[in-house]
Amino acid sequence: MEFFYEEQVACIEDDKISNSHTKETGSTENTENNELQSRDDKTNEAFQKLEEEVNKRYEKTTSAFKKLVIEKDDGIEINLPISNETTETAQKYLKKLDENIHSVESLAQSYWSKMKTKNFWSGFSSFDNAAENDSNDKDENSKENEIAVGGNRTEAELRTLSKDKSVYLDNKMDLQLDPFDVDEKTEEICSILQGDKDISKLMNDIVPHKISYKDFWHIYFLQRNKILDKESKRKEILSKKEKETEEKEVEWDDEEEEEDDDKVEAVADNKSKGETKVAVSQEGLKDVSDHVGLANKDESKDDDDDDDWE
């Protein structure tokens, strides 16, 4: 019996030892699992923070890019932030460049018009024709230069309406004197904006926080009508000058024809007079020769008589 009890006690103690060992092993595994779980949680938190930061940066970059780049039906428009001083300086240099280009164009056009005129090379025939053709070339060149300068001036003034915001912000015209319905001009405004990107950009920059939409287009149409009226008046003046010069040229041609006819008649009269003088001189020479022949005969007779007398 004692042996049996001892075995039972030994078994119980072995069970306790195994249970304690199992508990220790389970506790160590649990601690290891807890440590791994905490590490995983920290890693997930770090990745989550990184993703949030990347998303924030991406959103900021996207918003800034959308402000700079605008997608449209006909392409992409890039709007770079430029100061007013830089814009004004660029406008000044562009105006100077336009003026220089216009002067070069006018000189080239005047030179080409002078070279292509018919009277330019024919003017070397005589001094009078050269002087006349030179004056005609100058008149034609001045007219063509006036036309070219007028057209370039009109184009430059129309370009200022599309680029210079001071035209609208520094307006001194009384808009109330001229009634204007912007709704009636909707189709025309749409066509203008589609064809001219500069005025579209200018309108987006100053409308509506600096000037209203209605006043902007009211000023635009008033200024454009003034520019076109000036151009039409210039063309009328040039057409009148052309008519006057054509009439003067016709009168000069008639006078030259009359002078040429008078010169031809005078030459014919002088020629007839010269022939008459020659005829008279020939008859006189014949009479003189006859008289000389008779005189020689008389002298020969006298000589014969003297010989006979001797």
Curated annotation (Swiss-Prot):
Disulfide bonds: none annotated. Residues 176-228 form the BSD domain. InterPro entries: BSD_dom, BSD_dom_sf, BSD_domain-containing. Residues 15-26, 135-146, 264-276, 284-300 have a biased composition (Basic and acidic residues). Residues 247-263, 301-310 have a biased composition (Acidic residues). Residues 15-45, 131-151, 240-310 are annotated as: Disordered. One of its GO terms (cellular component) is cytoplasm. It comes from the Eukaryota. Coiled coil: none annotated. Acts in ubiquitin metabolism and is necessary for the control of single-copy DNA replication. Present with 3270 molecules/cell in log phase SD medium. PANTHER family: BSD DOMAIN-CONTAINING PROTEIN 1, SYNAPSE-ASSOCIATED PROTEIN. This is Protein DOS2. It comes from Saccharomyces cerevisiae (strain ATCC 204508 / S288c) (Baker's yeast). The lineage of its organism: Eukaryota, Fungi, Dikarya, Ascomycota, Saccharomycotina.
